[in-house]
UniProtKB/Swiss-Prot annotation:
This is Adenylate kinase. Keywords: ATP-binding, Cytoplasm, Kinase, Nucleotide biosynthesis, Nucleotide-binding, Transferase. Belongs to the adenylate kinase family. One of its GO terms (cellular component) is cytoplasm. ATP binds at G10, A11, G12, K13, G14, T15, R123, T132, Y133, K200. It comes from Vibrio parahaemolyticus serotype O3:K6 (strain RIMD 2210633). Its EC number is 2.7.4.3. Consists of three domains, a large central CORE domain and two small peripheral domains, NMPbind and LID, which undergo movements during catalysis. The LID domain closes over the site of phosphoryl transfer upon ATP binding. Assembling and dissambling the active center during each catalytic cycle provides an effective means to prevent ATP hydrolysis. HAMAP family: Adenylate_kinase_Adk. It holds the Pfam family ADK_lid. Residues 30-59 are annotated as: NMP. It catalyses: AMP + ATP = 2 ADP.
Length: 214
């Protein structure tokens, strides 16, 4: 089962990725993790990536695609894998196709921008421990205070409205065209495209996914 997850930042991809991994026993392939592992291991591609990063540049699609090819050839990907955060652009999707990587399911989590802004704006974090809360969905016992230490909670810069809206802008510009791309692939019978309402409760979305993948 080879799956690609699509959805804006804050649409709940990470939560459902964990559910899919546990349920179907397939690894999540994160390009960030792969890059770090390749650099640490000192592989040929890792060395190339490190040189680019050290020069303050973006790692090319070619290097990322090479890393993905190496990663999915490993034993734990025999039953499939879950790609999260890749592809982000049409050229990357074309690159996967040219490499002969078949995709069984493309899963989109659909959430309106305003809902995402509200979700992110409600997040509160206790920075020393990494514990996170939400003023509506997962409030602390005492408003504005960490449950364990009683220390102040803060709004991370990443969760501030202007930052969230900027990230959503990039997503719509770069990644949203993939929705159309994979819609056409599905129409041609090359993959299955599944769209879920990301505003539902987490357990409901998980149940919907399980039913669709059965």
């Amino acid at each position: 089962m080879r799956i690609i997850l699509l959805g804006a930042p804050g649409a709940g991809k990470g939560t459902q990725a964990n559910f899919i991994m546990d349920k179907y026993g397939i690894p999540q392939i994160s390009t960030g993790d792969m890059l770090r592992a390749a650099i640490k291991a000192g592989t040929e591609l890792g060395k190339q990536a490190k040189a680019v990063i050290d020069a303050g540049q973006l790692v090319s699609d070619e290097i990322i695609l090479g890393l993905i090819k190496e990663r999915i050839a490993q034993d734990d990907c025999e039953k499939g894998f879950l790609l999260d955060g890749f592809p982000r652009t049409i050229p990357q999707a074309d690159g996967l196709k040219e490499m002969g990587v078949e995709v069984d399911y493309v899963i989109e989590f659909d959430v309106a921008d305003d809902v995402i802004v509200e979700r992110m704006a409600g997040r509160r974090a206790h920075l020393p421990s990494g514990r996170t809360y939400h003023v509506v969905y997962n409030p602390p016992k005492v408003e504005g205070k960490d449950d364990v230490t009683g220390e102040d909670l803060v709004v991370r810069d990443d969760d501030k409205e202007e930052t969230v809206r900027a990230r959503l802008g990039v997503y719509h510009e770069q990644t949203a065209p993939l929705i159309d791309y994979y819609g056409k692939e599905a129409a041609a019978g090359k993959t299955k495209y599944l769209k879920f309402d990301g505003t539902k409760q987490v357990a409901e979305v998980s149940a919907d996914i399980e039913k669709a993948l059965a």
